[in-house]
Amino acid sequence: MPIIYYVIFAILYYLPALVANGSAPFVKNGTPIDFRKNFVDGRRLLGDGKTFEGLLVAVTFGTTVGIILAKFLGIYWIYVSFIESLLAMLGDMVGAFIKRRLGLARGARAIGLDQLDFILGATLALIISKISLNIYEFLSIVVIAFVLHILTNNVAYRLKIKSVPW
């Protein structure tokens, strides 16, 4: 099968997670999910960048994508997109937790982790939902997510949506 098919299927499978991950940063000054609590190391659990409002917006936008995809892929995709969006954001929170443990401040660059934490959460959701992926689709989305992360963050920085270009 030509590589373009793997790329197309990867984008379709991961579109709810991509949209969810891209929409959360638009929420400013929400209620932190960690309620500003510290871990045993004295550092914040997640930080101010992970909010209930951002989570709600992300899951709502990701699920909305699933409603649209359901017209083409079947009603099951509404469920898949909800779980995928939720677990993508959970993956993003795990990434934030790891960054805090490493002593990295909010917005600090962590190449690889910044681009792939939400993809791993979304992949878990697809597996739970019994959506079969092959290695080519997974590798395609890893490359796509990495490139999109760099491009969209640079655009968001130039538009003053983000304070750093990564």
Swiss-Prot record:
Keywords annotated in UniProt: Cell membrane, Lipid biosynthesis, Lipid metabolism, Magnesium, Membrane, Phospholipid biosynthesis, Phospholipid metabolism, Transferase, Transmembrane, Transmembrane helix
GO molecular function terms listed in the Swiss-Prot or TrEMBL record: CDP-2,3-bis-(O-geranylgeranyl)-sn-glycerol synthase activity
Pfam families tied to this protein: CarS-like
The keyword Transferase is annotated on this UniProt entry: yes
HAMAP family: CDP_archaeol_synth
GO biological process, one term: glycerophospholipid biosynthetic process
CC annotations in GO: plasma membrane
PANTHER family: CDP-ARCHAEOL SYNTHASE
Annotated pathway: Membrane lipid metabolism; glycerophospholipid metabolism
Role played: Catalyzes the formation of CDP-2,3-bis-(O-geranylgeranyl)-sn-glycerol (CDP-archaeol) from 2,3-bis-(O-geranylgeranyl)-sn-glycerol 1-phosphate (DGGGP) and CTP. This reaction is the third ether-bond-formation step in the biosynthesis of archaeal membrane lipids.
Subcellular location: Cell membrane
Enzyme Commission number: 2.7.7.67
Transmembrane portions of the chain: 1-21, 55-75, 78-98, 110-130, 131-151
Reaction(s) this enzyme catalyzes, per UniProt: 2,3-bis-O-(geranylgeranyl)-sn-glycerol 1-phosphate + CTP + H(+) = CDP-2,3-bis-O-(geranylgeranyl)-sn-glycerol + diphosphate
Gene transcribed to yield this protein: carS
Membrane topology value: Multi-pass membrane protein
InterPro entries found in the cross-reference section: CarS, CarS_archaea
Cofactor(s) essential for the protein: Mg(2+)
Protein name as catalogued: CDP-archaeol synthase
Cleaved signal peptide residues: none
Similarity section: Belongs to the CDP-archaeol synthase family.
